[in-house]
Amino acid sequence: MSYSVGQVAGFAGVTVRTLHHYDDIGLLVPSERSHAGHRRYSDADLDRLQQILFYRELGFPLDEVAALLDDPAADPRAHLRRQHELLSARIGKLQKMAAAVEQAMEARSMGINLTPEEKFEVFGDFDPDQYEEEVRERWGNTDAYRQSKEKTASYTKEDWQRIQDEADELTRRFVALMDAGEPADSEGAMDAAEDHRQGIARNHYDCGYEMHTCLGEMYVSDERFTRNIDAAKPGLAAYMRDAILANAVRHTP
């Protein structure tokens, strides 16, 4: 069975112009031509196109794709194994980037407009500017992002120091509660969680209980947050998450 260039373009999600270009450069030459001279693609041609698109998705230039596919020592299974390895590596990298984007958003919501050195001092080895473009792309349309940018635009270094001092005091309160053996759903722990929520709302953006619990989950799901928080006391991130959740339940009708 053979397929027209329009059919193949529809199958593959590419343009007819792209297929013409692949033919012109010898990357994907149709196996057949109709009596009228129109391109006709076989199933084998579609297999090759699939390989081309895999490699293109992985960022390979067309000349390298051609060299890989025309290598007489490689068979289709070898290409699939290679592509699987490359795609798995890319997935891992994207997962790490997604986690970094979430942390960058939280960093921005906390108003980090200091020097790079000061940012590192507050957040350890994470630099929010590294993923600024991804932060804007993913979160730029959210109310929280806009509120935080507007509210913090005029903050001075003294304002940031005050906010950091408040955060440090809250950390000491949580640590003291843990040291005293107070459970995360105790009045003291829930009160500390409520002060944490109100601090975010006061200094950055409207932070309801649902959003607050999402932040609490991030403290344990993102290892960089966990590492930064647990530096004060091992297990603190999970304790804060549990206290935040208990406080949200307390205030939910």
From Swiss-Prot:
Keyword Transmembrane helix applies: no
DNA-binding region residue numbers: 5-24
One example GO MF annotation: DNA-binding transcription factor activity
Residue ranges of domain HTH merR-type in the record: 1-71
PROSITE patterns hit by this protein: HTH_MERR_1 (PS00552), HTH_MERR_2 (PS50937)
Keywords, alphabetical: Activator, DNA-binding, Transcription, Transcription regulation
Subunit structure: Homodimer.
PANTHER family: HTH-TYPE TRANSCRIPTIONAL ACTIVATOR MTA, REDOX-CYCLING DRUG-SENSING TRANSCRIPTIONAL ACTIVATOR SOXR
Function: Transcriptional activator. Is activated when bound to the antibiotic thiostrepton.
Name of this chain's protein: HTH-type transcriptional activator TipA
Organism: Streptomyces lividans
Organism phylogeny: Bacteria, Bacillati, Actinomycetota, Actinomycetes, Kitasatosporales
Gene name as annotated: tipA
